[in-house]
Amino acid sequence: MAVISETSDEGSNGGAANKKPQEEEENIPPIPKELPEELIVIIVALVRRYHYPKLSLISKAYRDLISSPELFQTRSRLGFTEPVLYTSIGFPPFDLPSWYILHRISLQFKQITSLPSMLPGSAVVTIDYKMYVLGGFIGLNQPVSTMIVIDCRFHTYRELPSMQRDRGGAAAGVIDGKIYVIGGCKKRYNDWVEVFDVENESWETVPGPYPNVASESVEFSQYAVMEQKIYILDPLFCLTYEPRKRRFEAWGRRSQQRRYESCCVVNDMLCTVDSTCSHGYPIVVYDPKGMVWRPVKGVQSSDLPNLVYYESRMANFGGKLVILGGNQSRDRKDSYLEKDIWCIEIALEKREDGDIWGHVESRSVVLSSSKWPLIALSRSVTV
């Protein structure tokens, strides 16, 4: 790039006496009026996500960019994606469940009014920045086949093709980029298992054989994906389903697994809360090889708030175990009035000797209410 310097009329700077500044300026490459699209995507990807709503107000071009898959892919490639925690909380008997998002700075749940209430018995799975909500019950336990997808970047949703069968209390999991849904209807149906192609947005029936040990009318309480298998808690038995081999396996009676009302997978470990501390610790991890539950050492009951753990919900939050649970806090008059929802974040580590150790990194009240909350579920997405 040429540099324009001041010159005297006599050319005393040693340059050509007759060369004018305008001639040197012609050597400067023109500044592009528009930045390359690839550079714009990278620049916006570097901006913190909470600024996106304001950016989207600038112009339609920004709105299109912020909603584009290219921006998410660029953020993922640059390592700028972040986990976001969602939960569905109701206040029975009058208030239907609403979606809430955890704000990382204030550590408070904020209600999302733009999303519909999640039906009781819905199955929910996540893929990147999307949550898929399948089935559920309406009225007097009438199952439905509906399916919606929630875009967690903008808290919008749209309907997807319905399942082939009405389902309530089904299990679901994402394997190889496809959504498998199991049960939630009579087992005698040939479409007891269905698979949803996310790219083509189409359903297909997955043929049997189906497990003989599962209940005839199945409503699963919990499910999670680990080692390319869907782990399912049946009312009577614990099952795994391996879609690649189309194979079901039983891994013990549920009575032997005690009452584990919530579970999630963190770092390929199936975690749950054992409120009875039958293993000496309140958190346990399932060992699929030994088919036994093992304690998470280092986390004592005294490290955790006094919560109603059989109504708690768990999630994998950026590689950490998160537990959401409610308790009642006393006011100054020592009467039970305010109900709190706590968020506990626990780091897990599997050591060389096979022991699992945990450390409570944070515990805080994230929502308070005069009504008793019912936490329907907790999920983490990447945005």
UniProtKB/Swiss-Prot annotation:
F-box domain: residues covered: 29-75
Origin: domain of life: Eukaryota
UniProt entry keywords in alphabetical sequence: Kelch repeat, Repeat
Stored SMART domains: Kelch
Region described as Disordered: 1-30
Kelch repeat feature ranges: 130-177, 178-223, 262-313, 320-371
One Pfam family here: F-box
Name this protein carries in UniProt: Putative F-box/kelch-repeat protein At2g29810
